[in-house]
Regions:
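A helix-centric hydrophobic-segment signal that preferentially recognizes long
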Residues: 2-184
Length: 184
């Protein structure tokens, strides 16, 4: 290599190192914010999944002819429980889509279950069922809030990662945009 090429290479490397320092700490902080928001989403979905067995058992006692709906809810819960939900999901569009679809299936199955319970006045009068229903409604609200925070946090992170000079820093340290929820 001649002196000019060596000089350009040195300048390029120096510029990359100087610019790559730009935003490094902020990238790390925003990445941690995304991870924290994702953990909250997971916690709320897990809380909902934990309510399902109790809800199914209470409904079984009253709605003996609704086996199909009860089976759908149980299968949806099993599907959700069988999914991988670590940080890799945030960087893998296919896994993220499967996770989102499984949660949507759970939401749909629970909605059908609650609709079926309208036909059973004795069940609706059951104190344990009412308590579980209130807990489920509260959990659905928490899920909505957690998802909203996650969407906002990912949007902030993804915007930052794509801006210059942070885009260079992100590329150097292997940080990529994160997956986000689509509309249900």
């Amino acid at each position: 290599m001649n002196a000019i090429k060596k000089g350009l290479l040195a300048l390029t490397l120096t510029s990359t190192l100087v610019f790559s320092g730009c935003g490094y700490n902020t990238l790390q902080a925003k990445d941690e914010s995304v991870n924290a928001a994702w953990s909250e989403v997971q916690n709320q979905y897990q809380r909902r999944a934990d309510l399902v067995p109790n809800l199914v058992n209470v409904v079984k006692g009253y709605a003996t002819h609704e086996e199909k709906v009860l089976t759908e809810v149980t299968e949806a819960r099993a599907n959700v429980a069988g999914l991988k939900v670590d940080k890799e999901v945030l960087e893998n569009p296919e896994l993220f889509k499967k996770y989102q679809e499984a949660q949507a299936q759970m939401t749909s199955a629970l909605s059908r279950l609650l609709a079926v319970t309208e036909n059973y006045p004795d069940l609706k009068a059951n104190e344990q069922f009412r308590d579980l229903q209130v807990q489920l409604e509260g959990t659905e609200n928490r899920i909505s809030t957690a998802r909203t925070r996650y969407v906002e946090t990912v949007q902030d992170y993804n915007t930052y990662v794509r801006q210059f000079p942070q885009a260079m820093t992100a590329k150097v340290i292997g940080m990529k945009t994160k997956e986000n929820f689509s509309a249900d």
